[in-house]
């Protein structure tokens, strides 16, 4: 009986975490505004060292979450992205990922 109570409490905890982690498209639209400064420019390259900046509109949501978490933790190295991601909460990351995943990567469509 005790195990059942523990499992029930654990299930409630996990369900509340998933509800919190769900991304909000409209919030992501506001939070992703600065992303377009680099990622919204076709053929954009940042200065030394030169990196091609990928267009991230329409990218897979889970990929975006993993990438932003990697930049936040420092596992992925890019000074600009590390600094940008450092300020993001997990909710911010989810919101931004949901918004960007719903966009197009076709510049002519924008």
List each language-model region with its residue ranges.
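Electrostatic cytochrome c docking/interface patches
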Residues: 15-32, 44, 52, 105, ...
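Bacterial N-terminal signal peptides that target proteins for export
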Residues: 1-7
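Gly/Gly-Pro-rich "capping" loops immediately C-terminal to redox-active cysteine motifs
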Residues: 25, 29, 42-71, 82-84
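C-terminal capping alpha-helices of c-type cytochrome domains
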Residues: 73-76, 84-110
């Amino acid at each position: 009986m005790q195990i059942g109570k523990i499992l029930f409490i654990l299930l409630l905890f996990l369900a509340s975490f998933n509800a919190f982690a769900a991304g909000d498209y409209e919030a992501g639209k506001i939070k992703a505004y600065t992303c377009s400064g680099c990622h919204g420019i076709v053929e954009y390259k940042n200065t030394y060292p030169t990196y091609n900046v990928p267009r991230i509109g329409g990218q897979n949501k889970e990929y975006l979450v993993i990438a932003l978490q990697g930049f936040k933790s420092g596992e992925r190295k890019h000074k600009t992205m590390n600094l940008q991601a450092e300020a993001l909460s997990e909710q911010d990351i989810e919101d931004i990922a949901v918004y960007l995943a719903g966009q197009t990567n076709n510049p002519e469509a924008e």
